[in-house]
């Protein structure tokens, strides 16, 4: 589930979809960890309740990696300022988040370990899709697609199926 976004919020008398996602062990929580779509305290709540079921996603749109300015999303003009994309009425319109930034944000904003945040971006999505036998971690017999991060969790190198890629 696309946790917190596009659904009823968590309320103590009506926990709704968020409450179900936090408590139902069958649910995977897709989380846009940019600090705009989901408040850091709400991200931390997900970690307390469902750390092993969080899947980091970006919800990135065409302005990702681009300078601030006007863009279109599904035919509607949107404005990006400071990396945050909004509609004319002020609503969020996708994100400009990268996966490595989501990993850094989880570590910085929620206190999870780098290994836990990396699993949220690699092993957990593979488990959610049922392909963790071939993807999501480095083990003999699995596909060797690897992202090398520095100590600050910034991308340094990428290998796709064992081949060094340029980026």
UniProtKB/Swiss-Prot annotation:
Enzyme Commission number(s) from the entry: 3.5.1.-
Reaction it catalyzes: N-acetyl-D-galactosamine 6-phosphate + H2O = D-galactosamine 6-phosphate + acetate
Pfam families, A to Z: Amidohydro_1 (PF01979)
Superkingdom in the source lineage: Bacteria
Signal peptide coordinates: none
GO molecular function, one term: N-acetylgalactosamine-6-phosphate deacetylase activity
InterPro entries: Amidohydro-rel, Metal_Hydrolase
Keyword field contains Transcription regulation: no
Alphabetically ordered keywords of this record: Carbohydrate metabolism, Hydrolase
Matching PANTHER family: N-ACETYLGLUCOSAMINE-6-PHOSPHATE DEACETYLASE
UniProt record similarity statement: Belongs to the metallo-dependent hydrolases superfamily. NagA family.
Protein name: Putative N-acetylgalactosamine-6-phosphate deacetylase
Gene transcribed to yield this protein: agaA
